[in-house]
Regions:
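Short, surface-exposed, charged loop/turn segments at secondary-structure junctions
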Residues: 34, 67-71
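Short secondary-structure boundary segments
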Residues: 22, 53, 74-75, 109-110, ...
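Active-site-adjacent beta->alpha loops and helix N-cap segments on the catalytic face
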Residues: 1-6, 22-42, 56-61, 78-98, ...
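Short beta-strand/loop segments at the ligand-binding rim of alpha/beta enzyme cores
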Residues: 41-51, 99-108
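Catalytic cores of alpha/beta
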Residues: 1-12, 54-68, 101-107, 111-130
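Conserved beta-strand positions in the central sheet of alpha/beta enzyme cores
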Residues: 17-20, 50, 71, 129
Length: 150
């Protein structure tokens, strides 16, 4: 959801939550995250918003802006987090985020086994998003093939 155009289109469907890219990446028109967040809040004050973050710093910043949910969606997928795996050091990043933010944390991104879901739920996240692990048959098949090649 990079611009208000997409937000307006989504609002026609009456979504429960809308996620915004809360990284330091450039947005169309050079709009900052703070400017975009404030514009969405002004137009749709009751809409629940989730910050898709890739680093602790982004999560803390998004929390300060007032996002309803802080997501780990983009951990490992940005230049700033390319060497980070969500499960590193026993999910240390999630633990740090939980300790530093006041809004609900949603674990998302590489939470691809029941064991990982159980682990992060036990840490106190509000919810877990399991995406590719269940929605893309080619990704599921790839993991089986990798296991057979060992």
């Amino acid at each position: 959801t990079p611009t208000m155009k997409e937000i307006d289109e989504l609002m026609e469907a009456k979504p429960e939550i809308i996620a915004l890219d809360a990284t330091n990446r450039l947005r169309p028109g050079g709009v900052t995250l703070k400017e975009f967040y404030n514009a969405v809040r002004k137009e749709y004050p009751e809409q629940l918003l989730m910050a898709d973050c890739s680093t602790l710093e982004e999560a803390v910043y998004a929390d300060g802006l007032g996002f309803d949910f802080i997501g780990t969606t983009l951990v490992g997928y940005t230049e700033e987090s390319k060497d980070v795996r969500i499960e590193q050091n026993d999910f240390a990043l999630i633990r740090e985020i939980l300790n530093r933010v006041t809004h609900r944390v949603i674990a998302e991104g590489n939470i691809n086994t029941p064991e990982k879901v159980h682990k992060v739920m036990g840490m106190g996240v509000y919810s877990v998003v399991v995406g590719t692990a269940i929605t893309r048959p080619q990704a599921i098949t790839r993991e089986f093939v990798k296991a057979l090649e060992k």
